[in-house]
Swiss-Prot record:
This is Cytochrome b5 type B. Belongs to the cytochrome b5 family. The gene is CYB5B. It comes from Homo sapiens. The modification N6-acetyllysine is found at K34. The chain crosses the membrane at residues 123-140.
Amino acid sequence: MSGSMATAEASGSDGKGQEVETSVTYYRLEEVAKRNSLKELWLVIHGRVYDVTRFLNEHPGGEEVLLEQAGVDASESFEDVGHSSDAREMLKQYYIGDIHPSDLKPESGSKDPSKNDTCKSCWAYWILPIIGAVLLGFLYRYYTSESKSS
Ligand code: HEM
């Protein structure tokens, strides 16, 4: 009966109220994946989890498309449709938490720029052998033409 679970923002007025966002709930992908029915339907858009159960029959795009994305990452499909900013605003109502950081794909690339690095080195891997081959070609021609002329 201690009741000491009250949130800090309820009474705290000592100027430290900026950390409200720390109370984010994290869900694992496997938990979201279980909510894939008409009874309970969650989906993930850009690393955020949305409970769209009560939105199903309100969705202008139909409940079928939502069911197809049930329990999985729907970011791509959501973007492909080109949803309006109104639609994006609506997302907030259904937001229930974030995907656990260790389940996040390196999609947003801010933490893991290794994709760019690989691309850069890809380029180097391509260009170096080509430069080598061209140089060898020139050397070969230089030597063969020299031996012809003398
Ligand atoms: C919670 C997430 C979603 C919300 C709040 C939402 C909201 C909306 C809204 C408001 C519209 C009307 C058009 C607009 O304003 O852009 C719409 C249309 C549509 N949505 Fe969604 N949507 C969501 C998720 C999805 C997903 C995951 C798909 C998967 C493919 C999808 C497919 C569509 C389609 C195909 C239309 C077009 C309907 C038409 O043009 O006739 N939506 N959605």
